[in-house]
A protein has these predicted regions:
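Active-site-adjacent structural elements that line small-molecule/cofactor binding pockets in enzymes
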Residues: 1-341
Length: 341
């Protein structure tokens, strides 16, 4: 059994349950404790690039990552501009995490058609990499045609790492072909092991080193002696994703062996708001929590981190459940501090 040392990331999400001042303070504390990276997401809350810009100017060494920036809400050119700006502001600390999001958010929030996500991801990354290289961009793809422009910005001498949030067999395989890292969310250790096969197959197709891809899953985490309280938070969090975020997470949980639970959660979520939320959370079983989350005592959470390390994870990214206040976040950060593992 292995414990990952000095390699932990911190995901802030986009629910904005903490104030901006609290987020800055927590990020600075994470930097002091040896956390390697901080990640900001975006769904329909604050956008990731603005949040990370604020964090970049208040920190000096911790890496900053988009978690994730959706490729359906920005053009490849805009993504390249934003990445170049943030990498410059942060002094070369950016990790560009990209994802397709899902049909519900893309169609109902951004008003865009969710079409050909795999092809779009491939072309977006092609164009962004070309733009960030400083070369003139002349690109003719199936979805994007860009001609005659060179990014007008002071560019870093390094290659900005690009990581992909992917779930399915084909998308994970493509991640192995074209990305520097894989950003799954809520995987079991069994799914990590299975997906590493798909990643390796993609890397082989692209004639890449099969170990070149960072394995950085998002893991729902809370360390507390009040086991019942944090498990209830985790139940509510998973219920929201499985029941209220379209079919993506519902299908993911089914793939991981929890079909009955997933259907019960989705059915409960469809009920009137308060009744539905409570029923959906109650349908999240202890077996699901034990397989998918890291909540409980310090000893139990460190044991779970070791299990993920054994499965092939290289950089766990810790996400806190909805309802976690600053005290719980600080307690968790201190309990898992990389400089003491």
């Amino acid at each position: 059994m292995r414990i990952l040392r000095r390699r932990l990331g911190l995901a802030l999400g986009s629910a904005n349950t903490l104030s901006r001042a609290e987020i800055i303070a927590l990020t600075r504390r994470a930097e002091e404790l040896g956390y390697e990276s901080v990640w900001a997401g975006e769904s329909w809350g604050f956008d990731a690039f603005t949040t990370l810009t604020e964090l970049a100017v208040h920190t000096s060494t911790i890496k900053i990552g988009t978690h994730i920036a959706t490729i359906f809400s920005r053009t490849p050119g805009m993504l390249a501009q934003s990445a170049a700006s943030l990498d410059d502001i942060s002094g070369g600390r950016l990790i560009l995490g990209l994802g397709t999001s899902g049909p519900k958010v893309v169609r109902d929030w951004h008003g865009q058609s969710w079409e050909r996500p795999l092809r779009r991801m491939r072309e977006v990354i092609d164009i962004v990499r070309l733009a960030l290289s400083g070369e003139r961009v002349d690109y003719e793809g199936e979805l994007f045609k860009v001609s005659g422009f060179r990014l007008r910005a002071a560019l870093s001498k390094r290659d900005v790492p690009i990581m992909i949030a992917s779930l399915g067999h084909r998308s994970v395989g493509q991640t192995g072909e074209i990305a520097d890292g894989w950003l799954p969310i809520f995987p079991t250790t069994a799914l990590v092991r299975e997906s590493l096969i798909w990643l390796a197959q993609g890397a082989v197709r692209a004639k890449r080193d099969t170990t070149a891809v960072e394995i950085a899953p998002t893991l729902l985490t809370a360390v507390s002696d009040d086991d019942a309280a944090v498990r209830d938070m985790a139940r509510a969090h998973l219920a929201f994703y499985i029941g209220g975020m379209g079919s993506f997470y519902h299908d993911l949980v089914i793939r991981q062996g929890f079909a009955t639970e997933a259907d019960r959660i989705k059915s409960a979520w469809a009920k009137p708001r308060r009744e539905g939320r409570e029923a959906a959370a109650a349908a999240v079983t202890d077996e699901m929590l034990d397989a998918i989350t890291l909540v409980g005592s310090r000893t139990s959470v460190l044991g779970r981190l070791s299990a993920y390390a054994d499965a092939g994870v290289t950089l766990p990214i810790l996400m806190f459940p909805f309802g976690a206040d600053r005290a719980l976040v600080e307690q968790t950060l201190e309990a898992l501090r990389p400089d003491r593992q």
